[in-house]
Amino acid sequence: MRSAHEVLDMKEFNRRGFILGGAAAAAAGCTTAGGKVENVSSPVQAAKPFVEPKQKPLDPYKGTRGVPLKVGTPCLQSAASTSMGISWSVSGLAKGVVEYADNPQFLNSVTVKSGGFGLAPIDISAIQVRLTGLKPATRYWYRTVTTPFTDYSNIYNAKLGEPIVGKTYSFSTLGEGNRGKFAMICDTHGQWKSYEMRAKFLKENKPGLLLWNGDATNTTQDKATAVEIFLDPPIPSADFAAEIPMSFVSGNHDYRGSWISKINEVLLPRLPSERSSDFWDLKWNFAERLGDMAIIGMDTGEDKPDAHPKWFGLANFEPYRKAQAKWLEQAVTRPEIASAKFKVLFCHIPLYAAPDHPDYPHDGVKVDPQDYAYWSRECFDLWNPIMEKAGIQLVVAGHKHRYRHDLPSPGRRWHQVVGGGHELGMSRGKPDAGRFPTVIEGVIKDGRLVVTAHDVFKNRIAETFMI
């Protein structure tokens, strides 16, 4: 006879068996004493098939890891009389130097590392080198040397690949002895077809200085976009920038995008030594000589008020324009600028309304969405008294995507030329003959400044005039 304890154990055993059996039957869709069980999941899950964990993407800062390094064509930037910036694209982690000399044989050549003092920077997308101590109006030959890091797990295990020596190019520094012409393009907006038309023209005509007068970009959300636009554009004539010194003038679109504040990583600003300590932050303004011409760069900034909700409290352009006025006042009194026979100022947004504007030629309107608003008027009010006193004869602008030439008028003794944009005879899907990409050239002939507007879409001269 079983003890009470044994009877309880048997009951517990039978109860557990019933539960487990019922669960198994339910899993198999069988009928139990409690009736047919349907759609009941078993508490005992079937083993899941083994799935290998996803591999993390390779960290580009760990090295190229056997992938061949692609090296782009160099781009001359921030041209000056005694310095030159050189930037080029790379497809992976690399270091770079520039070798240069005042002769094509590279006799007594100089090698310059990227960066300044201390540790030379390395990068996965762009290398930047600044040549300093150059002679004004002098021709130099140069080439890039780029070396990939095949592995960079840490400083003790880093490995270098074979150096890649670039093609030899040449450039001439700015200065009074450089008798080259200037060329201006604007509002390219990353539109490659019209950009190629301008690049091809520049490559064939070889100006002494290119002014890229704003709106090179649209909205820049990452570094790759900036590298493509400034260093590695997908056009046949991209190598024009390797031998034509360029100075960049910011447009309103060149301030848009979550990444754009880091543009210095792709586009070299002016050297700190080229501006006094009072204007340390004015890294895009410049005043240089190109023969008998003084070339001055000003930044009109964004095309909306600082308080506009689209800026989310980030805009600080109104104080920026005032600071530039103080800089301009000093720049135009520098002996090499003041003594220039012709003084040309470049800015993106026009400082004066179009002739068909209802307020032309007085520009008294404060806000005009059709042509320009008070931000441009603000620049005019701040800068024009200085420009008039200094004898500025020509302002070259963009922004409007339509070529025009404004003659001098009372209170404004300078001509204003506005370059065309990227449109090819169309505007918002409709034919518009006034929309065409331009290259604006300026050259001194027989003691006169000759300005020519080239329509590179129809391969014609839109206008030529003399000052």
PLM features per residue range, with description:
Residues M1-F13, A24-A27, E38-V40:
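N-terminal secretory signal peptides
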Residues L131-K135:
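Short, flexible loop/turn segments at beta-strand junctions in immunoglobulin-like
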Residues D187, G214-D215, G251-N252, H348, ...:
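Active-site glycine-centered loops adjacent to acidic/histidine catalytic or metal-binding residues
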Residues T32-L76:
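C-terminal segment of N-terminal export signals and the immediately downstream linker at the start
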Residues G66-V71, S78-S83, V90-G96, Q105-K113, ...:
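N-terminal active-site segment of His-dependent metallophosphoesterases
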Residues L119-Q128:
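Aromatic sugar-binding surface patches on proteins
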Residues C75, W141-S170, A224-A338, G364-Y374, ...:
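Extended active-site neighborhood of metal-dependent phosphoesterases/phosphodiesterases
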Residues A47-K54, P408, A433, I440-I467:
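A short C-terminal boundary segment appended to hydrolase-like catalytic domains
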